[in-house]
Amino acid sequence: MPSMRVTTDTWPRRAAQEPLLLLLLRSSLMKSASLQALNPNRAMAAMGRSVRVVLDSSVLLDPSGVTAEEEEVVVALRPGAEALLRRLRYSNLRVAICHPEGLTTNESGFLEKTAKLYSFGYMPLTSPSGSNLLNELMLEWSETNFCFYVTSGVHEGLLSELQNHNWEVIAMGNEDVIKNSGVIHISMLQELLITLATSIKKEIGNSSAFVVGYVMKQSREEDFAKRGAFPIYPSKNDLIFVPLSFELPLASQLQEVDLVLHKITDEIINIDPNSSISFPKGISFSPGMSEIIRFVEEHCDFCVIDPFKNIYPLLDRIQIQEILIRLEGLSAEGRPKLRAPCFLKIESFCGSELQKQLAEAKLSFPLIVKPQVACGVADAHNMALIFKIEEFSNLSVPLPAILQEYIDHGSKIFKFYAIGDKIFHAIKNSMPNASHLKSSSGGKPLTFNSLKTLPVATKEQLLQNEVQDSKLLDINLVEEAAKLLKELLGLTIFGFDVVVQESSGDHVIVDLNYLPSFKEVPDNVAMPAFWDAIKQSYESRKQMTQT
């Protein structure tokens, strides 16, 4: 968010405004007392009710914005505030930003725009209109009896009023500033989310509620969060999600959560190309992920979804092929053949025996060339489609690599997702048949990144395929494969891609991955399945460690 400049430093005036805030709050809180008496058991009442979080401007605005030369104040969010607000936006908590009377127009305007940007409530506590607004809000909130007030330092009288009416107060900063024993203290803004999560679990008092700490790259987290995957307010099956922060001591965070959901491949720094691919050998993880791995190794009863050793095979396309070959036993008379694509591992593109090796592997052109490392490094998805052996020269695909048959599949790919015990699938447009690709290649290898620049069939090519008598997908066969894969892999959530070969009707599994986005599955179906899968996996693993 862009910063704003104002000409007057208003921070010294904040303390003088606290008595006004206290005055405005008192009348509303007194009116709510009788309603609270009707519902004294807050722990039992918490589930199914809203959780409110009021963020005082003091925890959001950066107090160090004065420039000595210009004597101006830069109105901006303090470090860590933007990430906090982004996560709170999709937390299912009801959040409001408040500020006392006395801020400049630029400061209050900045806060109002911030609240609007993140879809939060905005509460300018000014008199007289602010009093009426606050009265109305407090009367409404009194029915929830589950509110947090977050500040970096307030009037002691205000704290007492809030606590007398069952508000939780979280104060950031030096504990010596606030002597009130009932205040929850945090030293950094990054501690707020895990503090909220553990406080909510404590207030619920429900033994079936679990705190899930999660680790993944920011873009993936945001994609999941926007779909409602990571609520801090408990999900329908009592899961509370909170991101693990590498800016804070991890050991203390891991002691506060019940389990960790991770995308370990997001935290790979490097894979040594000179080491034999026998993961985790040769993998360098981020310092934070390395610490989590050590913690899990030292605490064998700690639950991670999924165990690291179960995921390592999916980093290697050779191991993926070997896993898929084990599914071929599902094929039977009267059913399509289920198989992995024919493949060959190569260490060099210049070998004199390459033509012979291709024949022995039953491979013919065109071929897809893929790096053996399947994910976690920048070039893992750099691939090529080649149409003759001469095109191997000067190929830029990383080695070692696998050569895989290209399957004409009518430009349709079936994406399957196993989420716990539930299996979903979606149909997507895919690469056109080889004849179309060859005509557009210009006699050169067709290079692409499978995540970014995958060549997809044109509308005309899709229409041609629709007219053709395409083979139908055997859903039952693929679902059986999904169940067997779940047993073989020991994974809670995974995905795989199936294409149906036009010439034979063979069902060929061409890709396998851990914790996919499953964005093709509607959120109202996917998210409950996602939460159930996590909880069932956790309870199953805990039961195993206790026996």
From Swiss-Prot:
Residues 327-539 form the ATP-grasp domain. Gene3D superfamilies: ATP-grasp fold, B domain. The keyword 4Fe-4S does not apply. Its cofactor is Mg(2+). It catalyses: 1D-myo-inositol 3,4,5,6-tetrakisphosphate + ATP = 1D-myo-inositol 1,3,4,5,6-pentakisphosphate + ADP + H(+); 1D-myo-inositol 1,3,4-trisphosphate + ATP = 1D-myo-inositol 1,3,4,5-tetrakisphosphate + ADP + H(+); 1D-myo-inositol 1,3,4-trisphosphate + ATP = 1D-myo-inositol 1,3,4,6-tetrakisphosphate + ADP + H(+). GO terms for molecular function: ATP binding; inositol-1,3,4-trisphosphate 5-kinase activity; inositol-1,3,4-trisphosphate 6-kinase activity; inositol-3,4,5,6-tetrakisphosphate 1-kinase activity; magnesium ion binding. Binds 2 magnesium ions per subunit. One of its GO terms (biological process) is inositol trisphosphate metabolic process. Mg(2+) 2 binds at D511, N513. Pfam families: Ins134_P3_kin. Mg(2+) 1 binds at D497, D511. One of its GO terms (cellular component) is cytoplasm. ATP binds at residues 317, 370, 404-415, 430, 450. It comes from the Eukaryota. Disulfide bonds: none annotated. 1D-myo-inositol 1,3,4-trisphosphate binds at K263, H381, K415, N513, S517. Monomer. Belongs to the ITPK1 family. Kinase that can phosphorylate various inositol polyphosphate such as Ins(3,4,5,6)P4 or Ins(1,3,4)P3 and participates in phytic acid biosynthesis in developing seeds. Phytic acid is the primary storage form of phosphorus in cereal grains and other plant seeds. This is Inositol-tetrakisphosphate 1-kinase 6. The gene is ITPK6.
